[in-house]
Amino acid sequence: VELKNIFKTPCIRHNQTSRNTIRKVALCGGSGSFLVRTAIKDKADILITADIKYHEFFNEKIILADVGHYESEIFSTELIASIITKKFPTFAFSFSDNNTNPVNYL
């Protein structure tokens, strides 16, 4: 439920939630399923990303959470703005309120 609130999405596809404690999180905006092996190697308990394929959800070594492609990338603009503002304090940003996500949920 917390992930749904953080990523402002009505649903999250995931494989398992049986682990009591999540100590290490791997996060990739956009299509990050190619990082499953790396996340396991780095001992992540969960990989939060998008565009995870059906058969990848059978992996029992890590929790996979697919929050949606758009939803996983939406915060990158704020992060980039924060980084640029630290380097260039007088740089002005204007963020659009337009939702460009072509995916809708019922």
Give residue spans per PLM region.
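Active-site catalytic microenvironments in core metabolic enzymes, especially phosphate/sugar-handling
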Residues: 1-106
